[in-house]
Amino acid sequence: MSGTFLGFDFGTKSIGVAVGQRITATARPLPALKAQDGKPDWNVIEKLLKEWQPEAVIVGLPLNMDGTEQPLTARARNFANKIHGRFGVAILLHDERLSTVEARAGLFEHGGYRALNKGSVDSASAVVILESYFEQSF
């Protein structure tokens, strides 16, 4: 087992990406992927999987604050299932409530408004999702 994990913050226009290590329980952002109505370029995802060879992929599960599902929840779950179906990699879904809020706060703290572009926020959210998964699981 490599101890490497990829994290995805699913969105219909942009999908945040992060890579992390279980041993350090830390993650770092990778460039966000463009998506057309939630559909990524699967060749790019394949390249990420080949490059990082993750033990598992963590996909953020968007839930309402009360824990109920929202319309995007099913689409994120479908995205996760497609990754598993196409590439056979282990998939874990992880609650992503407040990940975008935390990501925006961290980016703003380090770079002000200029740091708050869509791709940066999405990949920073993927970092938050992955590190939250590590904290709860290991």
UniProtKB/Swiss-Prot annotation:
Q: Where is this protein found?
A: Cytoplasm
Root EC class: hydrolase
**Which InterPro entries does this chain map to?**
RNaseH-like_sf, YqgF, YqgF/RNaseH-like_dom, YqgF/RNaseH-like_dom_sf
Query: Cross-referenced SMART domains, in alphabetical order?
Result: YqgFc (SM00732)
Question: Mind listing the GO biological process terms from this record?
Answer: rRNA 5'-end processing
Q: Which GO terms describe its molecular function?
A: nuclease activity
Alphabetical keyword list: Cytoplasm, Hydrolase, Nuclease, Ribosome biogenesis
What job does this protein perform?
Could be a nuclease involved in processing of the 5'-end of pre-16S rRNA.
- Name of the featured protein: Putative pre-16S rRNA nuclease
